Amino acid sequence: MAVIKVRKTGQVIEGEDNVRAFLNSQGVLYEHWDITKLPEHLRDKYVLTDEEKNEILATFKDEIEDLAARRGYKTWDIVALSDATPNLDELLKKFEQVHIHTEDEVRAITAGHGIFIIKGDKETGYFDVELEAGDVISVPEGNPHYFTLMDDRRVVAVRLFIDPSGWVAHPYEEKEEAVQ
């Protein structure tokens, strides 16, 4: 289950209903998928063949298609990151820059962990959303954020897009408050 940490205040928000309510107040979609549907051999695997990626997509076909129909997503894929990923540190440097997108950034975590650091409203400031398997998040178009891995440096996620070109980040320059 996701855990939120508000950087300004140190407040920690836990529990599915509390997390969903907080994220909803910030315009961020949060859902939870039943990760027990995923075959056991894929639950802790971070180097995936194309066949295994397709198996994950097939497992969550109904959830993906439902989310796509509700939010206008047209294409999806699997991203798998771990210490076995070539150039992982370079990729993380790219991901760890505060940026925006011209569409939602959607991730459904199927294995491992990741953190989205998201700019909330003026009162809230930046907050961390620690995600684990089963957590689904959609950071709205134009909302400053970045993503990084947790200490285990492993994640597998379904990514959904409107634009078939996939993940395209645009730099964001902080005008008033730094990411603390």
Curated annotation (Swiss-Prot):
Q: Which cofactor does it need?
A: Fe(2+); Ni(2+)
Binding positions for Fe(2+) per the UniProt entry? H99, H101, E105, H145
The reaction(s) catalysed by this protein are:
1,2-dihydroxy-5-(methylsulfanyl)pent-1-en-3-one + O2 = 3-(methylsulfanyl)propanoate + CO + formate + 2 H(+); 1,2-dihydroxy-5-(methylsulfanyl)pent-1-en-3-one + O2 = 4-methylsulfanyl-2-oxobutanoate + formate + 2 H(+)
Sorted alphabetically, which SUPFAM superfamilies does this protein's record hold? RmlC-like cupins (SSF51182)
Binding positions for Ni(2+) per the UniProt entry: H99, H101, E105, H145
Gene Ontology biological-process entries = L-methionine salvage from methylthioadenosine; L-methionine salvage from S-adenosylmethionine
Annotated site residues (Important to generate the dianion) in this chain: R107
Q: Where are the transmembrane segments?
A: none
Question: Does this entry carry the keyword Oxidoreductase?
Answer: yes
Pathway involvement?
Amino-acid biosynthesis; L-methionine biosynthesis via salvage pathway; L-methionine from S-methyl-5-thio-alpha-D-ribose 1-phosphate: step 5/6
> What is known about what this protein does?
Catalyzes 2 different reactions between oxygen and the acireductone 1,2-dihydroxy-3-keto-5-methylthiopentene (DHK-MTPene) depending upon the metal bound in the active site. Fe-containing acireductone dioxygenase (Fe-ARD) produces formate and 2-keto-4-methylthiobutyrate (KMTB), the alpha-ketoacid precursor of methionine in the methionine recycle pathway. Ni-containing acireductone dioxygenase (Ni-ARD) produces methylthiopropionate, carbon monoxide and formate, and does not lie on the methionine recycle pathway.
Oligomeric state and interaction partners are given as: Monomer.
Q: What is this protein called?
A: Acireductone dioxygenase
Q: Which organism is it from?
A: Geobacillus kaustophilus (strain HTA426)
| Gene name tied to this protein | mtnD
